[in-house]
Regions:
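Extracytosolic ligand-binding ectodomains
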Residues: 2-4, 12, 22-431, 438, ...
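C-terminal motif of bacterial Sec signal peptides marking the signal peptidase cleavage site
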Residues: 17-20
């Protein structure tokens, strides 16, 4: 009887278990996923860049554009936020062919594209007429290479430059000629706003210092044969030939001076202070001089790092103005950040208040938009290289800074030399010690063998 009851009990239990297995559990409430934070809006900031990308100055135009592209790449990598939005910078590059008419055409194109700012143009001759179009549209413009003083003398509140102008450069070059013992000078310019402007400023400075101008000749920015004007200059027996123009003409001119047996030294401004000048002039450039606004890149705190990044990125050496164009972009972005706006009407005023620790200088502008206290550096061509001579002009602070940086560089070089010598001395000491140990071991071995 008990066995029967047990069987029944087991059957009931099994049935209950099966019944339980067939029941579904009520699902437990699951917390709703947290809402993802709303993505911040992105605003595209269009910066125009204009330079000759074709023709004899294309190498300089590409150099300028690369300086701007490197700056924009770094700004985008930082992920800047302005006015509550993430900013993405884009470069709109245009080719003005170093032609004033074409410069105005592409300037209007950028105005129509509603760019937030313009970096350029490269040449003074294209920058000056284009600047009126940008001014009328209220678009800020910063040039990293246009040095003719007229650019910032037009009264436009939108025009700025990040390097010394030709008044400053011409004065320094005139003073330098006197320091070199020059008594007579022949002047040649290419009739462009830059070339003629620089030559005129040099002439004023030279005459004020008592130099005699024995010839004043002209060419153009497309010429390659200068023998006619150089033959005239040869007859004057000038101590110095000053050229206001670019490297595409300066290099061949120096070469033809040598071919004609002209013994005078050649002196020019930033337009001929380039690797291209040496390439075109060859051995004829040896011993000649040129100037560049600013302090040598290798003597600037951030200079060597910038050069390494530039070469790695573009696979090319810096030609001339790339560091200044890089600074021009950075100054524009800095003004936008301070204004907390990318609207030209709102950030323009902040450009005038700039005090930016740039690559090429401590960038600040005077009431005209010119760089305050811009220095000028003199170079000499030696053995196919540009060799730094000295930094002149500019504010005492700028020159003093250059001298301090030069002294620091010399100390570093001396320290490397001392470290190298110490390393060599250490190597010799270690070698001598090793030889002594080896000799002692051999002597001990010989003594043991004798025993």
């Amino acid at each position: 009887m008990q066995a029967k009851i047990s069987v029944v009990a087991l059957s009931v239990a099994a049935a209950f278990a099966l019944s339980a297995c067939g029941q579904k559990e009520e699902p437990k409430p699951v917390a709703a996923p947290a809402a993802a934070p709303a993505a911040k809006p992105e605003v595209v900031v269009k910066l125009g860049h204009v330079a000759p990308m074709t023709g004899p100055q294309a190498h300089l135009g590409k150099d300028n554009e690369n300086g701007a592209r490197l700056a924009i790449e770094e700004l985008n990598a930082k992920g800047l936020e302005i006015g509550g939005a993430k900013v993405k910078f884009e470069l709109l590059g245009e080719d003005d062919q170093a032609d004033p008419k074409q410069g105005s055409i592409v300037a209007q194109k950028l105005v129509d594209a509603k760019v937030n700012g313009v970096v350029g143009h490269l040449n003074s001759g294209t920058t000056i007429p284009a600047s009126k179009l940008y001014s009328d549209a209220g678009i800020p413009q910063i040039s990293g290479s246009a040095t003719n003083p007229k650019y910032t003398q037009q009264g436009f509140k939108t025009a700025f430059r990040v390097m010394a102008n030709d008044v400053q450069q011409g004065k320094v070059l005139g003073d330098f000629a006197v320091q070199q013992g020059v008594k007579t000078v022949a002047i040649v310019d290419d009739r462009t706003a830059y070339g003629q402007g620089l030559a005129d400023e040099f002439k004023k400075s030279a005459q004020a210092a008592g130099l005699k101008v024995v010839a004043n000749e002209y060419t153009n920015d497309k010429a390659t044969d200068f023998k006619a004007i150089l033959t005239k200059i040869k007859s004057t027996k000038a101590d110095l030939v000053f050229y206001g123009g670019m490297d595409a003409q300066g290099g061949p001119m120096a070469k033809q001076m040598k071919e004609l047996g002209i013994k005078a030294k050649f002196l020019g401004g930033d337009g001929v202070c380039t690797p291209e000048f040496m390439k075109l002039g060859g051995e004829a450039t040896e011993g000649h001089y040129c100037s560049l606004p600013g302090v040598p890149l290798e003597k600037l705190a951030k200079g060597p790092e910038f050069k390494d990044k530039f070469v790695k990125k573009f696979g090319a050496e810096i030609q001339l103005y790339a560091p200044y164009v890089y600074d021009a972009v950075m100054v524009m972005a800095d003004a936008m950040k301070r204004a907390d706006s990318v609207d030209p009407a709102k950030y323009l005023a902040e450009i005038g208040k700039t005090n930016y620790d740039g690559l090429t200088a401590q960038v600040a502008f005077d009431e005209f938009g010119d760089l305050k206290g811009g220095a000028i550096s003199i170079y000499q061509y030696k053995s196919g290289k540009l060799e730094y001579v000295s930094t002149l002009g500019g504010s005492p602070v700028a020159v003093a800074k250059a001298e301090v940086q030069e002294a620091v560089a010399e100390v570093k070089d001396a320290a490397k030399a001392v470290a190298g010598a110490a390393t060599e001395a250490g190597k010799e000491a270690v070698k001598a010690g090793a030889d002594a140990v080896k000799n002692a071991a051999e002597a001990t071995k010989a003594a043991v063998e004798k025993k």
